[in-house]
Amino acid sequence: QGAVDWRKVKAAGIEFAVIRAGFGMYENQTDPRFAENMAGAKEAGIPVGIYWYSYAASADEARREAEICRKVIEPWREQIALPVFFDQEYEPAIKAQTRTVRTEMCRVFMQSIQEAGFRAGLYCSLDWYLNWLDRSRLAEWPVWIAHYAKKCGYAGENLIAWQYSARGRVDGVSGDVDLDEGYEGLLPARRNGWGQSGKGWYWYENDRPVKNVWRKTDGWWYRLGPDGRMLTGLQEVDGRGYCLNPARGTVGGVYVPEGACIITDENGAIL
């Protein structure tokens, strides 16, 4: 589809996008426009999810695909608001496997993604989900179904998105584009207050981490660092040393590292 003008996409009323990160088991199979698309969507303020197109023909290969996917998307972790989808389709090597093996490949990929701290889901056609996979072993996972009809042919509780057309047109994108409808659970509620990610605790305001400021909650002061992460231990802030509780990141008590003697003022600054 070439370069995407994400500002035009946003102006066209698009509320979310799922961007291809890559395919297969090797890092050189990263989508060449992945970083460009992620940056453009971020600048335009469009929430994004990820999909990884699979060629895996065994659980081990699916695990390898998940590992590569995780590596590729990690730098964009804070931007990824929607699930990371495993895209399993009608590749000959996949069709040649049993239903049990195909289902296990889905589970292995999604479990690996979830273990890395991302939300995980499955993308496939309605026919694939109903006839090529064991749905009873996938009911716990969100599913995004492609079914080009007036109404989605699947209405299970785990349905979070329906792709209803492959021939849509959106200003800012050249040629045909897939069109989707999102349901409850696709977009997370906007975060306000404390939230935890793989690196630590963050304070969110309107879904964005606050950076380089003090925040007071429940009677305690917390310092948020340059990446928004709550700071702990001995820290220098604006030229002054602070002793922040190693467990809570708070100022207000005296934390003395083992073997040290530290005196602080009433604000927690080291004297």
How would you label these PLM feature ranges?
Residues R70-F86, Y90-P92, L133-N158:
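Structural recognition of alpha->loop->beta junctions
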Residues V48, R119-G121, V143:
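Hydrophobic anchor at the start of a short beta-strand
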Residues E61-R64, W128-S136:
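Glycine-rich, charge-decorated loop segments at or immediately adjacent to ligand/cofactor-binding or catalytic sites
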Residues F23, W52-S54, Y90, L126, ...:
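A mature extracytoplasmic/lumenal domain signature
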Residues Q1-K8, S136-R191:
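Functionally critical loop-and-helix segments that line ligand-binding/catalytic clefts
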Residues A189-L271:
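Extracellular adhesion/carbohydrate-binding repeat motifs centered on closely spaced tryptophans
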Residues I113-N131:
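Aromatic-lined carbohydrate-recognition surfaces of secreted/lumenal glycan-active proteins
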